[in-house]
Amino acid sequence: MTIGMLIAALESRGIILSLADDEIRYRSPKDALTEADKAQLRARRAEILDHLRTRNAAKALRGVAPLAGPLTPSVGQEMWRAFAGGAQEGHPVALNIPMVDRFRHDASSVTAAISQVIARYDALRVRFEAGEGGLRALLNSAGSFAIEQEDLRHLAPQDAIETAFRRAQEFCAQVNLIEGEWLTRAKVFALPGGESIGAISSAHMIADAGSRNIVIDEIHDILEYGAPRAVPASSYNDYSLAEREFLAGPQGQQLIGHWRSWYQAQPTLRAPSDGAPLLWGNGIRMVRNFTIPGRVLDKVHSRAEEWKVTPFLIYLTIFSVALARWSKSEHFPIRVLGDKRTSLELSNMVGLMFCADAVDIAAPAGADFERVMRGIQAEYDTALALRIPTLHFWAPHCVRPGIEAPDHPNKIPAVFNYYSMGTARERAEKKAGPDATAALPWPPDVVTLPPQQWPRRSSPLFLHVMDKGNEAFVSLHFYQGCVSPPDQDSFTAQLFQVFAETVPA
């Protein structure tokens, strides 16, 4: 039993552990703490102490106050550049955050609204230069931001909309170089009837999916109400300076040390057919895509309501059980992509705020799905309580450059990403519209993309679930350097088998 599970089991009985003067204290109902509990606390005292110290450090990091200072790359941005920069930047795909939407306003109004948002967020105007002293951040002026225009008003209305969305996608697929003049670009397409489509493309190094939703909502607010309605967050730079200072201090060292020890204790999973170690590497990445139609998505949501959990947890458990059966391993780690916007003060922060939590998975053969899910839920809650804000490309304790060598191995075999896609406004509109997925088959048609040569680190397995409310786009990635084509086939089959067992047709 992990320490996280031990503490969760105690808390379920009302027994709360804490630290006072670096000594373990507990609060509990009368006679709740048994002699067996006390013996376990004594036997695992060192582990419990480390857990509680790390929990306190993570809590302190979540509450750190913004720190004013010079414009500086965040630790996350430095680690992103170490992953995505270099001569092969932009290959085979540009790593951008596309922000595209249709607006019931003309092109000049949307252009002005986009300009206002760009001026509001320094994080979208930052650029970088590399030198002997490391990576430097510089700020472009809001007045120098140029927004491209394309007039499609000569086309029939539906043709104009389809053309605009296609060209917006092409626009957002162009690489925004890390050391380019601008890492954010924008374009507005004028449509018949006084409408338009706006497209903003930011390099992932300066933005994330959460940033996308904030920006789209603010453009709508400016157009409809004259100004953003959301309470502004502090600047991304002030937030990241405070984070950097904290991680360099003693509590930051506690977090780094805890996760280094955790990582060193993790097993190295192996592929089932040839025993290849499931390590991150450079080479061929295979991608398989499919769509979950609305009727099936509704069943997932109903299952979540029945168990009083989120769809996120159901998908994570399906992925974990499939990985356990496929690898014939009951215990292993997974990285789960997350968001550092965990407080009201951070909820409207634009910038690189995504991170990846490391989660212990226990999925015993033959165990009931709900039992496995509850265990994963407890371990995920533990990971959040002990969060170190790292990116999934590196071992979890590598929160900033210099902690390990650049080629330090990443042996966490799988990454999971569940994204509730779109703003609340967008999801409501899609849900209220006609079901465009009614004719889609289930089980789905799986589309395998041509092999992609990735110069950057790839995870052995990576499952993306993009839930739009009315349908979900799913993308399953394999690093072929350690997951052979037969193993890719067997894992895909196992994933659909577990899904069918969990969410009956």
Task: Specify the residue positions occupied by each region the protein language model found.
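Flexible, non-catalytic linker and terminal segments flanking ANL/adenylate-forming cores
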Residues: 45-78, 381, 419-431, 473, ...
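A short, small/polar-residue-rich loop/turn motif at beta-strand boundaries
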Residues: 1-4, 103-119, 138-180, 256, ...
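Gly/Ser/Thr-rich phosphate-binding loops and adjoining beta-strand/alpha-helix segments
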Residues: 63, 68-70, 89-111, 178-200, ...
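Short amphipathic alpha-helices and their capping loops
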Residues: 3, 54-88, 111-155, 180-182, ...
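Flexible, Gly/Pro-enriched loop and linker segments at secondary-structure and domain junctions
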Residues: 18, 90-96, 124-130, 173-189, ...
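Active-site-proximal acidic secondary-structure segment that organizes catalysis
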Residues: 38-40, 45, 49, 184-238, ...
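Extended, hydrophobic beta-loop-alpha segments that form or line the acyl/peptidyl-thioester binding
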Residues: 28, 121, 125, 216-217, ...
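His-Asp-centered acyl/peptidyl-transfer active-site segments
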Residues: 87-95, 122-123, 180, 194-195, ...
